[in-house]
């Protein structure tokens, strides 16, 4: 088997998985149909006008306008309880002084002094609670779908009808200042705009101060009809510090001053709207649908009396989209075509002096216009697509017809209006609320055919991994010829499909194209492999997973079908990992494998191999198992609680040091983080020194000696700046900002340079040649010249290695007549593992920078836990047993589980609110401008760091048992005077070959790498398959969008990251292997001169 065949086959299997994921996703996460219809004054939804028509302004279209101007102040993440007085408190929170309570005191004062002029509402937000989706809802009155949450990195212009378009069409002057997301959503729509970068969540003041610089001068100038100010400081403070930090009190107090200043400048024809687009969790995050995230504040105020009654004791709860039709009608504009919100009828009552009958009639008129608009939208939408339930739609149309008939009768018979008005209002409200509920339920559209096809393709990919992992170690299995057939058929299928679409003039669907190519390549491979190989073997051998491992894997997969277990996966994963560890220990003891590997060298013809005495007993494996369980338990201390478990308390160690208030505690934690960093660096250097690779003069080891300390120093310096940036003197802030940009980039640049050096010179050995060596001596025996074929090279390389060991070992015993040594080489036995450990360390440093400082302790535990598991695995694998090399299923499963456990221990959860957005600004404190791929890459690297590290390090599962061959060696002692006999039987005194044993059988080595990669892909693949099945079966489950859909997305992205990392890790081993061959070839040529 060739090296290229291994990588190509694994890449092909990954492509099968990618095609299955893409096909399933295209059927599961569909967006709703966006209609391009627009409302206009020339096409009213139906007749109707307010009875107080003389109060309106001339030029109104559907309804006479009530206000000529509106000031809309959006305070991002203004949670409802932020507007509460000091005596209130959050449920399940102790009634203590909270930083966010009572800071918006001007709202309560206005409500008490002018109760008919103001109202405070609890705005109910529709998830997902990300900013861009909320802005779409606040301007269109429609609902975003789940998949739209992924668009929060890159905003796109709104094509649906919206308030901003209606305002500009009516000739109103719209002035905007604040969040630059509006620039992409409404390009060219504002008469004047002041945009500020919004994505830097560490910056609390730039956007807010920029708004304040222009807000009051713009108001005083009068050159506006609608003024929009979108403040971001509260949201950024939540992301950076959380709502319970003193900085939150400062930001809310600043917003309170802004509201007071606006109230003082308002004229009688102006309405002030203060709204939060969403709330935030107790950690300051948002994006999900928890109560704290979907509960936002909405405050309305006018210098003239608007409300006929005083505010209720408990603020009314209204859907957020209700603000859209309300503002449209109050300004005399058409309601946007796709709106499904319900007007806030109280605002159409006519004020405190109006009569109850006229107030109720005005409310009914506004509601009827609103209902006509929603009915028109439902009729148009149902004609364009079949999303809406026909039965429910028919019932709603009947309800609207009855309510509309009652309303028309009401206008024609004013004498009986008082008794009928409440009924008409109730019927119209029932219709509007029913229409909204139906749309929410129906817009979860699925393509069952694509979902089934994607699931089948994922299952087939898992099946290929399982079968091929067994075939890989079978001698003579023709992987390379078999791979050419499916690749050719895949290309033929893709070309035929593209040609068919071109013939019938249909748009090319890349997802379907990839699926056709995957199926076209999969079926021929399975047919040819089974016909030529699989049918000759017993069926039981094709499913090699041991019973206990299979049982634990089934438990693992069953978790994905329960929302409760998915939520509790952070606690279930350490339990399963501990079960695998105990299974390894018990199995080693039960099978009597707690011995050293049989340190045998390749016997010469006519000799027999020898066996060494035992190296370890059961206590050794038990100590390793206890150490692993202890690391697992310690890593579990760094946990983030899901929002569904309110009794849980997240670890305070996940927050950055900058959020800590006490200076002494911050310094102590900073010292602990630096100590963990130094410990990690020292452990890697000691390990490399232990096996001698650190003494190599090659560039990678020189970099480890000098470059790694520089990277650690840069990381520690960046942590110091980040933790104290807010406390820096004003004259040093420019310097601190510059250093915060330079240091992370320098660390990343050093890491990239180290990896480049490792790829260039991956063989880290030390070669010493003696001066004046006899030219007649040669190390090539029994060959007389350099190897002429790969077979010759594979045969003589182990002999060369043994000969150099023999010469080095016996140099003190040689006499001068024997002449000096020809050559001595060190560290060949750990050449593969040294490259892998160096690469993992270089990867870990930039990934560590993307996390909070105290996560460095988790990274230290990650390396320690991996080290213990590898040693436990090495304790029971006899590397010289005749036959192919293999890694047991329980070890591969435990390795994959450790990646999942570390994902949770680094403060992540498979939900959007738990994403660490701050990672996007590590090294880019000023933001990224219009670039979106780089922040997405940084956030992705932060989220899936554990997946990447464990996938790249997966080949260590194969290499480590050979590396540990040198431990506990007990060389047989020869009696004095027995040197001649020792020279006759040198194999009895030889040092262990360690990883050079892999070069004794290169075909077995490559087959073992392929099998390991297939096993790892199978473990990851069945997880994504289980998530897809759970999402399919439970697609109408109450928690599908809250639990199952996010879990599928995170597992899918995690699989892609892990598969790429696995290919990179195996490619690095292949690169080292090729470099070792080149090194030996050059040595052979040098010996012949």
UniProtKB/Swiss-Prot annotation:
Its EC number is 2.-.-.-. Changing residue 119 to W: In HPMRS2; decrease in mannose-ethanolamine phosphotransferase activity. Changing residue 344 to K: In HPMRS2; uncertain significance; decrease in mannose-ethanolamine phosphotransferase activity; decreased protein expression. It comes from the Eukaryota. Pfam families: Phosphodiest. One of its GO terms (molecular function) is mannose-ethanolamine phosphotransferase activity. Glycans are attached at residue 268. SUPFAM superfamilies: Alkaline phosphatase-like. One of its GO terms (cellular component) is endoplasmic reticulum membrane. It is a multi-pass membrane protein. Changing residue 871 to P: In HPMRS2; uncertain significance. Keywords: Disease variant, Endoplasmic reticulum, Glycoprotein, GPI-anchor biosynthesis, Intellectual disability, Membrane, Transferase, Transmembrane, Transmembrane helix. One of its GO terms (biological process) is GPI anchor biosynthetic process. Its main location: endoplasmic reticulum. Changing residue 370 to S: In HPMRS2; decrease in mannose-ethanolamine phosphotransferase activity; decreased protein expression. Pathway: Glycolipid biosynthesis; glycosylphosphatidylinositol-anchor biosynthesis. The chain crosses the membrane at residues 4-24, 457-477, 482-502, 510-530, 541-561, 575-595, 668-688, 701-721, 747-767, 830-850, 857-877, 944-964, 1014-1034, 1048-1068. Changing residue 255 to I: Found in patients with severe infantile epileptic encephalopathy; uncertain significance. It is found in: Endoplasmic reticulum membrane. InterPro entries: Alkaline_phosphatase_core_sf, Phosphodiest/P_Trfase, PIG-O_N, PIGO/GPI13. It is linked to Hyperphosphatasia with impaired intellectual development syndrome 2: An autosomal recessive form of intellectual disability characterized by facial dysmorphism, brachytelephalangy, and persistent elevated serum alkaline phosphatase (hyperphosphatasia). Some patients may have additional features, such as cardiac septal defects or seizures. Part of the ethanolamine phosphate transferase 3 complex composed by PIGO and PIGF. PIGF is required to stabilize PIGO. Belongs to the PIGG/PIGN/PIGO family. PIGO subfamily. PANTHER family: GPI ETHANOLAMINE PHOSPHATE TRANSFERASE 3 (PTHR23071:SF1), PHOSPHATIDYLINOSITOL GLYCAN (PTHR23071). Catalytic subunit of the ethanolamine phosphate transferase 3 complex that transfers an ethanolamine phosphate (EtNP) from a phosphatidylethanolamine (PE) to the 6-OH position of the third alpha-1,2-linked mannose of an alpha-D-Man-(1->2)-alpha-D-Man-(1->6)-2-PEtn-alpha-D-Man-(1->4)-alpha-D-GlcN-(1->6)-(1-radyl,2-acyl-sn-glycero-3-phospho)-2-acyl-inositol (also termed H6) intermediate to generate a 6-PEtn-alpha-D-Man-(1->2)-alpha-D-Man-(1->6)-2-PEtn-alpha-D-Man-(1->4)-alpha-D-GlcN-(1->6)-(1-radyl,2-acyl-sn-glycero-3-phospho)-2-acyl-inositol (also termed H7) and participates in the tenth step of the glycosylphosphatidylinositol-anchor biosynthesis. This is GPI ethanolamine phosphate transferase 3, catalytic subunit. The lineage of its organism: Eukaryota, Metazoa, Chordata, Craniata, Vertebrata. The gene is PIGO.
